[in-house]
């Protein structure tokens, strides 16, 4: 029989083993222009880098979420069972997403726990996730700037291990560089459907145009969209649907800006 906290220690040890492997990943040290080449795409794509980022973030923010669970009044036995469950990863990912969107997760998570009716709940993680989604849907988040890497990857924040923070920063830089490089490539070559809607504009590579195109390029690279449709099919998965809506908003902005440009109005 394991003593209290041993389940959590085992989870942390396993996570650190995974992180060690990720940190040895040589492809992460490649520069943006090198990662654009086809033979390096498997390791340097936003799909791969975002997956690494999320794995590191889950471990890096672990203590933060534990603190909020305790603040809400959950006892250690319940917390141990929660973090050992399969749904804990989904919950922590949702907390990071809401935090990056500007919601006050530090205040809201303890509040939804204190709302009660948690006794004998079979799936506490899913219930807390549902409550967080419900309460955050009722109001607009903080006016502070949303913290999204390349417009689609929620940024991890809060106090964390310095080594993990450095690993996150490195991957944030790589994701951003790749997304921007892909956006420039698309705008320069007109190789994607997203690029074609803005190429007629003289300002296609400046300001908001590049930012919006970067979001679309990041989405395509993360989810392997290669067809003529800028965003591909509407996804069924909840997590991808969130990213799809972000990319769709950027695409709409691109088209609206193009339609309003002098070049678009010219006969």
Model-derived features: positions:
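Alpha-helical structural signal
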Residues: 3-267
